[in-house]
A protein has these predicted regions:
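Intrinsically disordered, low-complexity acidic Ser/Thr-rich regulatory segments
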Residues: 1-67, 130-136
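Short loop/turn motifs enriched for small/polar and acidic residues
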Residues: 38, 81, 127
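Forkhead-associated
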Residues: 46-121
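Short, charged beta-turn/beta-strand-edge "cap" motif at the junction between a beta-strand
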Residues: 121-123, 128
Length: 136
């Protein structure tokens, strides 16, 4: 007589499945995407997001670690999805995420706009390298 657990199976999932995967070439090779800390405890730090993908902003952890006590452990996510497809997403943070002074849940962001998390002010910078112009 079969045991009562014969119908149950265990499946082990690959730990890497939940991690965001970065796609090569998602941002044009001649474009650089950065986030600069403009105010707060980490003022002056710059993070390169040019590879594209998703970056977690968090207190002392994550892809963009900040030493701001008002920033949640997993506060927000910056998504670089392609040319001019940049988003900021609040990750159910305690103190909220603000884009240009307005509280947001998920919002597209442009170069030069300001993102506030806790007491830290971040600015997204998109630099497109100029190409030489042929002489006429």
């Amino acid at each position: 007589m079969p045991g009562r657990n014969d119908h149950m199976t265990t499946t082990r999932l690959d730990e890497n499945l939940h991690r965001p995967r970065l796609k090569e070439g998602i941002v044009p090779a001649d474009t650089r995407v950065y986030v600069r800390v403009m105010a707060g405890p980490d003022k002056g730090k710059v993070f390169d997001l040019s590879r594209g993908g998703s970056y977690v902003v968090g207190r002392r952890k994550g892809d963009i670690p900040l030493s701001d006590d008002k920033v949640s452990n997993r506060h927000a996510e910056l998504k670089i999805l392609g040319p001019e497809a940049y988003f900021v997403v609040d990750l159910a943070s305690t103190n909220g995420t603000f884009l240009n002074g307005r509280r947001i849940d998920r919002q597209q962001v442009q170069g030069g706009e300001e993102i506030r998390v806790g007491d830290s002010l971040l600015q997204l910078s998109v630099i497109e390298q100029s190409r030489p112009v042929s002489k006429a």
